């Protein structure tokens, strides 16, 4: 029988990733023995791997995060290629966030939300409360001034939040989480990018069949042709993968 409260780690280009078999494994790992882990969750996909390679500051930020997991199918395939016996699957960050919120609602875990447009954040709060009775102890949209950051950190600390999710895009959200943890270390932090927009229906996610086939990137490209430059950049990652430079 597999022990869901532990997980192996795998290394890709110097970055250590947690190998979760599936979503249930991820949740059992994060809530091991009924105790929510503390630290920072960072989703890793091919685009982020490239950014890490090119930006030393981002690499340092992400290396410092305790829980780095494979959010992109390309990263999962690379892990499986380098480690043929690895039982690792993609855990999409948006799905993990929803499952965490559902679990938090069930257990009464205090949650603080950061980021997003004011109206999107308000809709996110309402939906979380209505859908899972999430105990939201505070929130802040993404439109605050740099000089307001410290006061926000103090608000988060005073709220007693055990889960803090930050939707500011990378690397802003990783910088925010690193700095906030200096004031409020006893929590699980999660960078969630555009998840609030997807959750509230402002952004349409790829249909399940596209996700299952590992073609979510193609769906996004067809929906937003302006992404072509970003997608072409990923050819570099494919070269790493197919030449075994992992």
From Swiss-Prot:
GO terms for molecular function: lipopolysaccharide N-acetylmannosaminouronosyltransferase activity. Coiled coil: none annotated. Keywords: Glycosyltransferase, Transferase. It catalyses: UDP-N-acetyl-alpha-D-mannosaminouronate + N-acetyl-alpha-D-glucosaminyl-di-trans,octa-cis-undecaprenyl diphosphate = beta-D-ManNAcA-(1->4)-alpha-D-GlcNAc-di-trans,octa-cis-undecaprenyl diphosphate + UDP + H(+). It holds the Pfam family Glyco_tran_WecG. InterPro entries: UDP-ManNAcA_Trfase_WecG, WecG_TagA_CpsF. GO terms for biological process: enterobacterial common antigen biosynthetic process. This is UDP-N-acetyl-D-mannosaminuronic acid transferase. It comes from Escherichia coli O7:K1 (strain IAI39 / ExPEC).
């Amino acid at each position: 029988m597999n022990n869901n409260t532990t997980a192996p780690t795998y290394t890709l280009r110097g970055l250590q990733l947690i190998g979760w078999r599936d979503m249930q494994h991820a949740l059992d790992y994060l809530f091991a023995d009924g105790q929510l882990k503390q630290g920072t969750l960072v989703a890793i996909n091919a685009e982020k791997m490239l950014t890490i390679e090119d930006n030393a500051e981002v690499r340092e930020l992400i290396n410092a995060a305790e829980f780095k997991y494979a959010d992109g199918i390309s990263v999962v395939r690379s892990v499986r290629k380098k480690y043929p016996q690895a039982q690792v699957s993609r855990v999409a960050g948006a799905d993990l966030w929803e499952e965490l919120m559902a679990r938090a609602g069930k257990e009464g875990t205090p949650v603080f939300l950061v980021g997003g447009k004011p109206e999107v954040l308000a809709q996110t709060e309402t939906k979380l409360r209505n859908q899972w009775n999430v105990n939201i102890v505070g929130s802040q949209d993404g439109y605050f001034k740099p000089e307001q950051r410290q006061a926000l950190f103090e608000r988060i600390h005073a709220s007693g939040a055990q889960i803090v999710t930050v939707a500011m895009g990378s690397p802003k959200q990783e910088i925010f989480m690193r700095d906030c943890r200096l004031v409020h270390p006893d929590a699980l932090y999660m960078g969630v990018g555009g998840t609030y927009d997807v959750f509230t229906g402002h952004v349409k996610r790829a249909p399940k069949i596209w996700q299952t086939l590992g073609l979510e990137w193609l769906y996004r490209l067809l929906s937003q042709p302006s992404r072509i430059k970003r997608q072409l950049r990923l050819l570099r990652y494919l070269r790493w993968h197919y030449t075994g430079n992992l």
